[in-house]
Amino acid sequence: AEAERLVHRWFTLEDPARLEPAERELFVEAEVDGLVLRGYVDRLDVSADGAMRVVDYKTGRSPSELFERSSLFQMRFYALVLWRARGVIPRMLQLVYLGNGELVRYEPDEADLLATERGIKALWAAIERAARTGDWRPRVSRLCDWCEHRDLCPAWGGTPPPLPLDAPTRALDPSVAGQAAPADD
């Protein structure tokens, strides 16, 4: 019933018979200063003049204006990866919120994507620093109210489990990142 409601809502927002996506579930990847960025774009539309529109579907409701900018990070990330991989900045980023039928559209520019790139590089530098030092400081926010791991979080008096000895290598070495840890003997 819920899936049917979401499909019906999608049909009220877009006429699928008129859509001719260039790509669906498109794997995107680019390297930025040695950092490999990758993800999956729900839908990529390309117009006759080559302009790209990146579309992402969300089953939930659109965020309030207070959180809208952070919800666009994923879309700016996709735009950055496409720009670096294809040499063209997408003209339009579009979030489709099927939960309440809202469309959020954003037109990125080079300055915006360069700022996104700087932010990603700074985040990765912080991850590298934490992996090398073992200093993973929690950041308390309202999202903690929904977290299932508060009992393990130092910010809430919890004790995290010890990291495997090879955790920094597994996190930072691209040749092993994302692979399962070897089984204990």
Question: Where in the sequence are the language-model features?
Answer:
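Short linear motifs at secondary-structure transitions and domain/linker junctions
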Residues: 1-2, 17-21, 68-72, 119-124, ...
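A generic secondary-structure signal marking the coil-to-beta-strand transition
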Residues: 20-21, 51, 143
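Short, surface-exposed helix-loop/turn micro-motifs enriched in polar/charged residues
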Residues: 16-20, 66-70, 87, 135-139
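Metal-dependent nuclease catalytic regions and adjoining charged, substrate-binding loops involved
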Residues: 82-185
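Mg2+/Mn2+-dependent nuclease catalytic core
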Residues: 26-122
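A non-catalytic, helix-rich entry segment at domain boundaries
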Residues: 1-24, 31
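Alpha-helical scaffold segments in carbohydrate-active enzymes
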Residues: 5-9, 77, 81, 149-152
